[in-house]
Amino acid sequence: MKPISIAIDGPSGAGKSTIARKSAEKFGFIYVDTGAIYRTVGLAAYRRGIASKDSAAVIAMLPELHIELRHGPDGLQRMFLDGEDVSDAIRMPEISIYASDVSAVPEVRAFLMEMQRSFARTQNVIMNGRDIGTVVLPDAGLKIFLTASVEARAKRRQLELEKKGKSLPFEEVLRDMEYRDKNDSSRAAAPLRPAEDAVRLDTTQLDFDESCAAVESLIRERFAL
């Protein structure tokens, strides 16, 4: 029987990661956050002193990288760069822009494509990102496009950072969010857009539990789980 694959796409701060992780846990699926993979490439460039928009230098460093995505006993995803667990380091605010810029480089996307697709070949998976339903898993059994107003997404990101002990002014978080929205939707390589057959879900007025319930309902309905 062919494994079930579910694609959850959407802009930064829409709740993709937390909702996808919770849903994967609910149904016993593997969870893959592709954004964390791009953040790991961004972190590698940042640590090497490479400008985020220096595509040539970013491409040149790719053969040197050893990136691993592992799942712990708790099912949580951990990212490793050259053997180091960088799962927390990639969440630094300054890495967000790096991740957005390097993900716009076609060579970076091609470099990471096989890693992403390999997870869906032998196991049930919920994968979230920006081009999962359109490029990475175009044949996914269910495609969901999560969105919310940019203000709501910026507020969520600010609260998320505060929980990690990182306080940033709302205006700064909002500017970063608007920058990423523009960058992600206008890039030439796999721009952010809903797949034609994606179910669109606006979570602006929904809290976390309500958003999870809506996604889980879609999964149950589609796959009779």
Q: What name fits each language-model region?
A:
Residues 8:
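Hydrophobic anchor at the beta1->P-loop junction of P-loop NTPases
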